[in-house]
From Swiss-Prot:
GO terms for cellular component: cytosol. It comes from the Bacteria. It is found in: Cytoplasm. This is Leucine--tRNA ligase. SUPFAM superfamilies: Anticodon-binding domain of a subclass of class I aminoacyl-tRNA synthetases, Nucleotidylyl transferase, ValRS/IleRS/LeuRS editing domain. Coiled coil: none annotated. Keywords: Aminoacyl-tRNA synthetase, ATP-binding, Cytoplasm, Ligase, Nucleotide-binding, Protein biosynthesis. The keyword Amino-acid biosynthesis does not apply. One of its GO terms (molecular function) is aminoacyl-tRNA deacylase activity.
Amino acid sequence: MSFQHEKIEKKWQNYWLDHKTFAVSEENDKPKFYALDMFPYPSGAGLHVGHPEGYTATDILSRMRRMQGYNVLHPMGWDAFGLPAEQYALDTGNDPAEFTKQNIDNFRRQIQSLGFSYDWDREINTTDPDYYKWTQWIFTKLYEKGLAYVDEVPVNWCPALGTVLANEEVIDGKSERGGHPVERRPMRQWMLKITAYADRLLEDLEDLDWPESIKDMQRNWIGRSEGANVHFAIDGTDDTFTVFTTRPDTLFGAAYAVLAPEHELVEAITTPEQKEAVDAYVKEVQAKSDLERTDLAKTKTGVFTGAYAVNPANGEKLPIWIADYVLASYGTGAVMAVPAHDERDFEFAKVFSLPVKEVVKGGNTEEEAYTGDGEHVNSGFLNGLKKAEAIEKMIAWLEETKNGEKKVTYRLRDWLFSRQRYWGEPIPVIHWEDGTSTAVPAEELPLILPKTDEIKPSGTGESPLANIKEWVEVTDPETGKKGRRETNTMPQWAGSCWYFLRFIDPKNPDQLASPEKLDKWLPVDIYIGGAEHAVLHLLYARFWHKFLYDIGVVPTKEPFQKLYNQGMILGENNEKMSKSRGNVVNPDEIVASHGADTLRLYEMFMGPLDASIAWSESGLDGARRFLDRVWRLFIEENGELTGKVTEGAGETLERVYHETVMKVTENFEALRFNTGISQLMVFINEAYKANELPREYIEGFVKLLSPIAPHLAEELWEKLGHEGSIAYEAWPAYDESKLVDDEVEIVVQLNGKVKAKLMVPADADKAALEQLAQADEKVKEQLEGKTIRKIIAVPGKLVNIVAN
């Protein structure tokens, strides 16, 4: 008989909600455990089977920690601002707030149907004014400290979508959404000065228990480089430009210089003969995103300006080119090219037949760039020196002659924070007619996003908010000065930068969260989510957290102590699940056909949590069969508890029980859920062979099962005669002395070849082993007619008989 999952799951989900089983108590002195999921964007498509993988992992840890005596904070909320809801509103004319609310209701229903132990009293929604009041408050603090500023920046403008797109949202010159053409144009944008935190964001990674691959991605994104700035004069003019290089020691090998097509000097230095070619190239580059321009695999393109720079080291004239791989927004927007010792410069030089001059020995620079160390040649006062010494000497020379200076640069750019969109947090700033700007005072927050039917882009590059005249235009009640509200909104990242803080104190009207509660719960103990957020979300959240630490709001320097990335669940054909491929598996269907416990068990048993694994219907069926076996072991056909249950402990199942408690606990704590589940299966196999089921062991088993299959475990716990929930029962402990084997297997060898395997007492000494080996029937046969010359016995391992 199999269990009726629909009935059991509904019953216990209602019980948990009605009894607020997982509501967190602040009033106790238990140790804390804060388990956080990356909260979802509530899309119209609903939950897919990839979501519950991470959620089940944090839920297992949360349920186990409660039973281990921890006070557990395990919340859920919605990252609900964003482009898809706005696009839906544009396409249908419906209100994005209404659409978002329906999606959230659907997500909540789906998540509750999977039995996760969230404290629903702490649910948050980034589009709720009581929430974004504090997102806006943080922005005003950044503004006060000079970390939020307005700048003219070249951006990816998409006329069809009427908004600016991040580099990551542009593919091959077209928008990721809809495939519309994208062009580069300068625009007034809000920026956040994340670069002010670059060194701390880098250094503090060392203390975090995060996957090394994610730390490396952040290190590369921040991209700290040490080197020098070198100043070049432009021949025949008073103009100069500066380049940053990590290899100032190769200055004598510079063959040409390259400016970004947008560089401010390009127009001034281009000769009349080259003007047409330069203008055409500049126009062509405008349609490309930064990611495309810096793609290492693409063929190098560029145009000569007709102008020459003067090498400060030797007075040589270097032709100045423009090329799209140099970005105005990165470094100084200019590079000195040393083709003999830089791969990209070498490729460019080969395409355009530019000279290649070796200045470091060790390679064949006719064939390829040599980037290793070696003795300097053709380098004046650096000749004979190795790289490190030559760099030091060149920097000293540059500083002495005022031709340059030592410099540290970062790949990290300031964060482009504004969006020309409606569905986001309004930026709480007013621009006055006298040219000044002020932040909206804290007592006037939240600055509410006004309702409007006019969500289409304004077309001017401003957001649709610019169309709402009565909202935009303001008058200062004290001075009568007229002003305009900022019409840009915040990016979707804003609300997710600090949501983990609001979960700690979600209803507080006076503070982002109370200092006492932040002190109690921070940092987050485990944060589980997809690796696609490795850089942006995690870096932005760390930046805001460090800022809040600096202004005394939070007590820790870092938000997330341990981070774990679950793998991806692929379609049965090993391809990524997507609507277009028609291979998306809907959890609602699985909950209906197999049950939530089966889905949870299957997703944890598929393989290691961090691996990407293909969905398998037969694997799902196997998970259900195991739960049915568990049910049948405990419950008779008539629905009553089996008569095999005996009171207390006893020797039956003793060893496998203690082994199961040990292995499940260790594996769950290490997030090796698949191996923990394997051990639960071992226990059930042994239990089926037993004539009696000692209550202590089977109750312990139900507790071990409960984090994975909570509905089934609650039902079995009730059938075992208990009232109330299993959620706060004590986690089982194991006795190490019960794990010691009474018997061990040894091998018996004859002249070094294995002839038999024997089970012998674990404490058998050499003499006993010799006797046991010789008494074995198989060994006797092999020894017939032979004389024993020597017996070597190793207790617990083997007996080797030498005979001829």
